[in-house]
Amino acid sequence: MSHKRLGFFTRLLDKTSPQARYRLATEQIQRAERAGFDTAWIAQHHFHEHEGGLPAPLVFLASVAAQTNRIRLGTAIITLPMENPLRVAEDAAVLDLLAAGRLEIGLGSGGTPTSFLPFGLTSDQRREAFTNHLNTLLRAWRGETLGHPDNRLYP
C-alpha cells in the first residue's frame, strides 16, 4: 500500500483580534506538525472576517514556514481573479524556496460575489479572469518570456 498523507484545512475564525487569529492558526499548524500531519491548508478571504479574513495567505505561510520544519503548507485557495498573476507566481516561487520546497498551491475562481467589486471585477467575470490569470501564472512558472524576451520569472 502506498503511503497515505494526512492533512488538515483551517480558517481564521476565532472570535479575537486579527493578530491573535494569526498566532492561533500558527500554533495550530505547529501542533499539527508535531502530531505527524503532512500538510496544512489555509483559505484566502478578502474583507469578511466571518469567512476567515485572510487576505494574504502567502505572507502568512512565510511566517509559518519560518516556524516549522517538515509540514507542507498549502493555499486552499488563492482567489486568482483578484490577484496579479505575476505577483502570485513570484511570491509563491520565493516562498517555496524559503520553505525548502514545502509549498502547495491551490487556486480557485472565488465565491463571495461582493468581494470582486473592489478589484474592478464582477462575479460574472471571475471565470474568464481566472483562465487568463492562470495562463499567465503557468507561463511564468514554466520560465517562458513575459512581455519581452528578457523578462522571465526569477525568484
Where are these regions (language model features)?
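N-terminal beta1-alpha1-beta2 module of alpha/beta enzyme domains
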Residues: 1-67, 71-73
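Glycine-rich "substrate-gating" loop/helix at the edge of Rossmann-like oxidoreductase active sites
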Residues: 48-52, 78-84, 122-123
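Short, surface-exposed alpha-helical recognition segments that flank or form part
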Residues: 16, 20, 83, 125
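A generic, residue-level signal for flexible/boundary positions that often mark functional hotspots
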Residues: 67, 72-76, 110-115
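Internal, glycine-rich beta/alpha segment that forms the wall or movable "lid"
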Residues: 2-4, 84-155
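Short coil/turn segments at secondary-structure junctions
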Residues: 12-16, 79, 117, 121
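Active-site beta-loop-alpha junctions enriched in small/polar residues
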Residues: 11-13, 45, 78-80, 108-112
